[in-house]
Amino acid sequence: MTSMCILAVDFPLFPRRFAKTKFSGFSLMDVGVAFFIMLAALVSPEAKHKQLQGNLNHLKGVTKKCVILVLIGFIRILTVKGIEYQSPVLEYGLHWNFFFTFACVKIMSALLYTLIPSTWDVLISTALLVIYELALQFTSLNAFLHNNDRTGFIAANKEGLTSLLGYISLYLATVVLGRWIVYRPR
């Protein structure tokens, strides 16, 4: 369904209520990335009770696989800019896209599982969400996200970069669900 929305959104007949949201809330198109992240977490080694703490080979393997995602991300940038295809800046920013987001989530999650015991993922997932919400409420992050300044790499890609905390938290939480529901010892 999300794939159809991604293709159909460029046509005038497509109902705007299903298009990506601009500042808050979510729509049918918004849940596509979240579901993809969740599916990746459900089938991950972390969810399957693999011991990864201290395992640098796992981190290296994930990083190698993510190089392909980063290359696809750059190809997407060049293609979109080359054919002058409209790409809403409020989606991910000027240069950011889904492929960079997914690569960062996979690498950061693998790094976390290499450094910490897997039993801490609930705590870390919750802490990331709390920290992000506190930053939105009590720092200038909210104002930064809603201003039109696109000076520098971080400001140009603020939507994609700041979404990483939420996606990493979602990944960790889904790993926990996978471990508890799908892969629990029987």
Predicted regions and their residues:
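Alpha-helical transmembrane segments and their immediate juxtamembrane cytosolic regions
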Residues: 1-186
